[in-house]
């Protein structure tokens, strides 16, 4: 069972309850994992012709045999009638278009630089958000970023 919801400055996230099946794959060391989910999704205050969500979550540690290099992330696709902004009227109101299919993935690549000087919690890396009709954004977007991460 899972709950999704919240609000941000830019757009609301419709509250939703999810339940379903989960399939977990891994290698012998658990350094490489893949989690696949097929979920029934009940979205509060929104319509969905197909009340489902597909989710994949992965982790690959020591990628390409390089100690400290990790590739991980998730991908979600679901179906929800929601409004995406396509412009602004002269009076300042948003012009919207209703879309139904939503996709988002956020693959991350991290390297543990701290392992070279006794600070194993310190990582540098990147995340790239790839999305289609997510939030109020119409169409495909690519949003890369760089980061420093401290593992607790």
Predicted regions and their residues:
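Short loop/turn motifs that connect adjacent beta-strands in outer-membrane beta-barrel proteins
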Residues: 1, 24-34, 61-71, 113-124
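Transmembrane beta-strands of outer-membrane beta-barrel pores
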Residues: 3-9, 25, 38-44, 60, ...
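Residues that define the transmembrane beta-barrel architecture of outer-membrane proteins
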Residues: 11-19, 32, 48-54, 100-105, ...
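Residues on the lipid-exposed face of transmembrane beta-strands in outer-membrane beta-barrel proteins
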Residues: 19-25, 38-40, 54-60, 107-113, ...
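A contiguous pocket-lining binding segment that forms or flanks enzyme active sites
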Residues: 43, 48-78
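Outer-membrane beta-barrel translocator domains and adjoining extracellular loop/strand segments
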Residues: 47-49, 83-96, 135-144
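An amphipathic alpha-helical core segment
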Residues: 72-113, 121-126
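Predominantly the C-terminal beta-signal and adjacent terminal strand-loop region
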Residues: 107-152
């Amino acid at each position: 069972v899972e709950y999704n919801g919240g609000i941000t400055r830019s757009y609301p996230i419709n509250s939703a309850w999810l339940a379903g099946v989960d399939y977990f794959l891994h290698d012998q060391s658990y350094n490489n994992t893949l989690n696949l989910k097929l979920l029934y999704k009940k979205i509060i205050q929104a319509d969905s012709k197909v009340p489902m969500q597909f989710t994949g979550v992965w982790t690959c540690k020591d990628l390409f045999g390089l100690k400290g290099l990790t590739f991980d992330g998730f991908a979600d696709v679901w179906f929800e009638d929601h409004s995406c902004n396509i412009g602004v009227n002269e009076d300042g109101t948003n012009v919207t278009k209703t879309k139904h299919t939503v996709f988002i993935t956020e693959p991350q690549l991290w390297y543990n630089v701290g392992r070279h000087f006794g600070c194993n919690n310190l990582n540098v890396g990147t995340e790239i958000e790839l999305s289609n009709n997510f939030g109020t954004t119409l169409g495909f977007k690519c949003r890369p970023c760089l980061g420093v991460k401290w593992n607790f």
